[in-house]
Amino acid sequence: MLWIENGRLINPATNYDKNVNILIDEGKISKITQKTLDETKNEEENCRNKEVKIIDAKGCIVAPGLVDVHVHFRDPGLTYKEDIETGAKAALKGGFTSVVLMANTKPTVDNEETLAYVLEKGAKTDLHVHTCAAVTKGLSGKEMVDMDMLLAKGAVGFTDDGIPIMDEELLETAMKKAAELGVPVSLHEEDASLITNNGVNRGKASEHYGIGGSPREAEISLIERDLEVALRTGAILNVQHISSKEGVELVRQAKKRSDKGNIHAEATPHHFTLNEEAVIKHGTLAKMNPPLREEADRLAIIEGLKDGTIDIIATDHAPHSAEEKAKPITEAPSGIIGLETALSLGITNLVHTGELTVSELL
């Protein structure tokens, strides 16, 4: 048995916030109390003769495990970057107990076999590993997957993350189907036709490197389109990793128009912590899609978190090898890790600054 004493227990789902003691028996919470261990033993017959490990949590917060709905564990196919086992260890170190993997592996999670591989390997870890399936076969944007089958086999949502779905007719069909099934569709909002070099904001950062970069219009245009499709179809939409102030405002207005509450949006720790100055300073280590933008965008994202426009913090944990990140800025892949640092970044940049309470962050 485990006895956690003197901790501050926070449960955001119920707005619970008290200093209490917690008794855990066989891996499950048996009792939450302000009584002492001896008093609790006298009340609980099943724990009188059991050995009890005691953890003094004075000055610490005890909370439910964190959930990250947007991670890349690179497994199968790209395991020199990360695999499900190492990704799970990183998640647990960061306080996460559940994650949702993206489908852009090799092969893509668009079939029963790959889905089963991911779920079976995830089940061998100490983490709750869930996964999305792709919206389109091979992330091609051309042919829909069998959503019914993949959902029945364990997928928890659908996304072509990493690649936008440019065919609006196909997207609308997919979102109608997802609405029928009651599952979310998560969309990567960057129109590649408007981007000269991804991962670097068109502005001060792109000028520093003498390249074309990625303009905010690439994100704005697709967020605007996809919100309209979601409102028409009634689908549950998750707008992934917002980077622009205009994108935040579009989501804010769409939420006001949604009578079902099906519009959701996520922000990453790097987008509420950093701006394009980090790309100038750190180069490829701060290169990600969508890119870090201006300070005004970072502040707008924080405002979106404060007023509930952005209702998800997701890491977009996306590891690469050191060799890949050592390439020139126009050749290095976009992506940054985040599972081990997300909570501390939230506490430092949102809680300690007075933007959110600990409960709101969690």
Task: Describe the role of every protein-language-model region.
Residues 57-122:
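Metal-associated gating/positioning segment near the N- to mid-region
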Residues 208-236, 285, 306, 312-313, ...:
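His/Asp/Glu-enriched, well-ordered alpha-helical/loop segment
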